[in-house]
Amino acid sequence: MVLSSADKNNVKACWGKIGSHAGEYGAEALERTFCSFPTTKTYFPHFDLSHGSAQVQAHGQKVADALTKAVAHINDLPNALSDLSDLHAYKLRVDPVNFKFLSHCLLVTLACHHPEEFTPAVHASLDKFFSAVSTVLTSKYR
C-alpha cells in the first residue's frame, strides 16, 4: 500500500503528538491484543502478561521504538525495518495475522488517547502506515 504525501504528513504529525507516551501506548496496545486475541499470548510463554507487568511494558517500549524508527524512515521502511523483519520471520516465526491484530489495537489505543486528533483522515493514514509496516515485517516469510 502506497502512502501519499498527505498520509506521511498525518502519520508524522500524529506520532509527534504521542511523544513520550509512545512506550505506554505500545504496552496498552499489547495488553489489548492479548485480551482481544488470546492466541497471541502463545508467543510470550515466558512473560507475565498481567496488567501493567514490567515485561509487557518493556515490550511495549520496543514496539514503540520500532514504530518511531519507521516514522523517521517512512520513505524507506524496508531498509529501516530489515533487522526486525529478519527476527520475526526467521527466529520468532510470528504468524503474520498477529501484526494485523496489533495494528488494530494500536489504532484503538491512539483513538482513545487522542480523540480530537483522530480524524477519519488520520485514522486512514495510520491504518495504511501500520499495514505498510506489517507488510515489511512479513516480507521475508516467503
Curated annotation (Swiss-Prot):
| GO BP term, pick one | hydrogen peroxide catabolic process
Q: Where does heme b bind?
A: 88
Q: Where does O2 bind?
A: 59
Modified positions (Phosphothreonine) are: 109, 135, 138
Superkingdom to which the source organism belongs = Eukaryota
Q: Which InterPro entries match?
A: Globin (IPR000971), Globin-like_sf (IPR009050), Globin/Proto (IPR012292), Hemoglobin_a-typ (IPR002338), Hemoglobin_oxygen_transport (IPR050056), Hemoglobin_pi (IPR002339)
Q: Write down which residues bear the modification named Phosphotyrosine.
A: 25
Positions carrying N6-acetyllysine are: 17
Residue span, Globin domain: 2-142
**According to its UniProt entry, what is the function of this protein?**
Involved in oxygen transport from the lung to the various peripheral tissues.
How it assembles, according to the record, is: Heterotetramer of two alpha chains and two beta chains.
Which family is annotated? Belongs to the globin family.
Name this protein carries in UniProt: Hemoglobin subunit alpha
Query: Where does this protein come from, organism-wise?
Result: Panthera onca (Jaguar)
The lineage is:
Eukaryota, Metazoa, Chordata, Craniata, Vertebrata
Which gene holds the coding sequence for this protein?
Answer: HBA
